[in-house]
């Protein structure tokens, strides 16, 4: 099956990393792939545009089936190959509801408060133009969001939706890993710290770890000394 799959992806992209974790969890580690370089705008190349008119990655093929959008790829893989590898969305109604809730909580809130509001502010705003009161508001919102997940992990004592690794973790963990890379001090969040160590050690995460993270320091560290 994996030999019929193909993924276009970029290193360090959370949208790319999520389906890569799913592919490993489902036992499809041998899938074909192409690592693109964002700085050269390779996502706008003809080979991707003919599959994804938006010129974005991840772009995924399973035989003749093309699936674009990170979350759609994750859900496609789980729904199509439910019986393969790790079951990431439970069949039990109560457990499924919990996982689905946490999936979409992470996708909406972690993306907005840690990435779009805080990280992108530092990327898109020159240092001399940054306003400390604006930074303080964004930092406070990020802290509040992280506090919610710290409490959640205090309740579950394991993963974000319960005792088992699930799609909720696939959608949540990369935001934490990226934030740690950019200076987040997990010493202030003991439950999240234990969670981070546990998930980081998973084979699926190690196999899909962004390669340039192993070789290059982050360009900016907006979380360092702030959270």
Please place each PLM-identified region on the residue numbering.
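GST-like domain detector, emphasizing the conserved glutathione-binding G-site
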Residues: 1-136, 140, 226-227
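Short, solvent-exposed turn/loop segments enriched in Gly/Ser/Thr/Pro and often Arg
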Residues: 10, 167, 212-215
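Glycine-rich, flexible loop/turn motifs
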Residues: 34, 44-47, 56, 84-85, ...
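Active-site-flanking alpha-helical
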Residues: 78, 175-176, 209
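GST-like fold's C-terminal all-alpha helical module
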Residues: 102, 106-201
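Acidic/histidine-enriched, glycine/proline-rich intrinsically disordered or flexible terminal extensions
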Residues: 212-227
């Amino acid at each position: 099956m994996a030999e019929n799959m193909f993924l276009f992806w970029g290193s360090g992209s959370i949208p790319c990393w999520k389906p890569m974790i799913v592919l490993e969890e489902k036992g499809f580690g041998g899938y074909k792939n192409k690592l693109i370089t964002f700085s050269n705008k390779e996502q706008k190349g003809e080979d991707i545009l003919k599959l994804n008119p938006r010129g974005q990655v991840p772009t995924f093929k399973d035989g003749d089936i093309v699936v674009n959008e990170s979350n759609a790829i994750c859900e496609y893989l789980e729904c199509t190959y439910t019986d393969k590898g790790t079951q990431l969305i439970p069949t039990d109604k109560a457990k499924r509801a919990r996982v689905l809730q946490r999936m979409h909580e992470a996708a909406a809130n972690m993306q907005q408060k840690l990435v779009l509001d805080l990280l992108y502010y530092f990327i898109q705003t020159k240092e001399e133009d940054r306003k400390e009161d604006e930074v303080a508001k964004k930092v406070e919102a990020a802290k509040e969001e992280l506090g919610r997940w710290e409490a959640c992990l205090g309740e579950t004592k394991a993963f974000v939706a319960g005792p088992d690794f699930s799609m909720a973790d696939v959608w949540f963990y990369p935001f934490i890993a990226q934030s740690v890379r950019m200076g987040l001090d997990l010493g202030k969040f003991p439950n999240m710290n234990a969670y981070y160590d546990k998930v980081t050690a998973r084979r699926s995460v190690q196999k899909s770890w962004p390669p340039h993270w192993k070789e290059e320091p982050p360009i900016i560290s907006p979380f360092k000394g702030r959270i």
